Amino acid sequence: MSKDTIANILTSIRNADMNKKRTVRIPYTNITENILKILLREGFIENMRKHQESNNLFFVLTLRHRRKRNRKGPDKTVLNLKRISRPGLRIYSNYQRIPRILGGMGIVILSTSRGIMTDREARLEGIGGEILCYIW
């Protein structure tokens, strides 16, 4: 595991989704908790619970499996997660230039002065911040 906790979250969820796993364990941090609450609220994950095992806190996520239909060949997952701002290259945006993912179908997760929030919430409040990731 690397020091980039957000990349670890996204990679764990992406790998579990690609391997058709129903649950995934993610180490607990405050940033992790805020991002997972957004994913739960937006419907990208089905359930989230906190679990403790010998002084180690972690989240157990239940993934929502949505598959593309009407395609020949194996099913592809619909969940896509992409890390944007990273420790070596921070990406910031004001509220007017926050990108729209798939015309508003996806979400952008931002870290603002008022906490971690989605692109829609940031536009409504009129604040920008660091673009953490895209999810569609």
Swiss-Prot record:
GO terms for molecular function: rRNA binding; structural constituent of ribosome. One of its GO terms (biological process) is translation. Pfam families: Ribosomal_S8 (PF00410). The keyword Transcription does not apply. One of its GO terms (cellular component) is ribonucleoprotein complex. It is found in: Plastid, Chloroplast. Keywords: Chloroplast, Plastid, Ribonucleoprotein, Ribosomal protein, RNA-binding, rRNA-binding. Belongs to the universal ribosomal protein uS8 family. Part of the 30S ribosomal subunit. One of the primary rRNA binding proteins, it binds directly to 16S rRNA central domain where it helps coordinate assembly of the platform of the 30S subunit. PANTHER family: 40S RIBOSOMAL PROTEIN S15A. This is Small ribosomal subunit protein uS8c. It comes from Morus indica. The gene is rps8.
